[in-house]
Amino acid sequence: GTVKWYDVGKSIGVYSTGVNADGSKSEYENNTHTKGLAMLGITHKPNKSLAFQFWNIYTENIFRASFLQIELDKEVGKKQKWIAGVQLFQQNRIGEGGNEELEKKYMQDKASFIFSTKLGWESHNWKASFNFTRITNQGRYTMPREWGRDPFYTFMPRERNEGLANVYAYVIKAGKSFPKQRVSANLAIGHFNLPSVYDFSANKYGLPSYNQLNLDLRYTFNGILSGLESQVLFVYKGKATNESIDDRYIINKVNMSLWNIVLNYNF
């Protein structure tokens, strides 16, 4: 894992590298060449109901990515509001995509495009939303997993859509907080319609379509333990395709459950 400092190029490929568009093993680990990266971010809130974010990442010789987020909320009663958001993501290969040799190239497609949106409702201790993400078939969305999680509205812990093209993702999220008890509970249910595991040009890691259920319970300590938070996370992933596939595309990928017990300290 990423437990030490890496050069930018060597940080890409620490985790699983998946396959090339022709199904052969990707070989970009320790073969990705870049002089570094630069990031520019702009946030603007013209009024209390509207907020904008724009981010641009330039990774020399690999890719350029632009991310735009627009969010709107509308108060509809005492401590209640409707919320809506739109995200647009455009990624383009630059230079060699990391390496001049195809099997060692990190970004093999010329571009990828993603659209994500949400519509929801919030009160002082309740929240619920419907979320949708579309990764077009323009190319595989490739963002180094070592650098963090996906930013899209359909993101669920222990879920990634990186390495995929032609995806339809639907997620319902609901949560309730209990301020006096310092407890919060969050539920998320998602359906992720993915290309065939044998469509290597659109499915880098051989992940089949799946349904996912997350239950997240948290307790925040106070007093001498102020800043400490405990978390119990349950995840279930179920295969959501009738396609006949090899066990290697099922084991540790779908038809599985996971429990995490975590202690976080927030400074």
Feature locations, PLM:
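Solvent-exposed loop/turn segments connecting transmembrane beta-strands
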Residues: T32-T34, I57-F67, L164-N166, P179, ...
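Outer-membrane beta-barrel "beta-signal"
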Residues: K253-F267
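Residues on the lipid-exposed face of transmembrane beta-strands in outer-membrane beta-barrel proteins
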Residues: L40-H44, L68-L72, T117-S123, F130, ...
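Transmembrane beta-strands of outer-membrane beta-barrel pores
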Residues: T2-K4, N56-E60, K74, L88-I94, ...
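Outer-membrane beta-barrel translocator domains and adjoining extracellular loop/strand segments
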Residues: T2-Y15, A65-Q69, G95-E103, Y141-E146, ...
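Membrane-embedded beta-strand positions of outer-membrane beta-barrel proteins
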Residues: G1, F52-F54, I70, A84-L88, ...
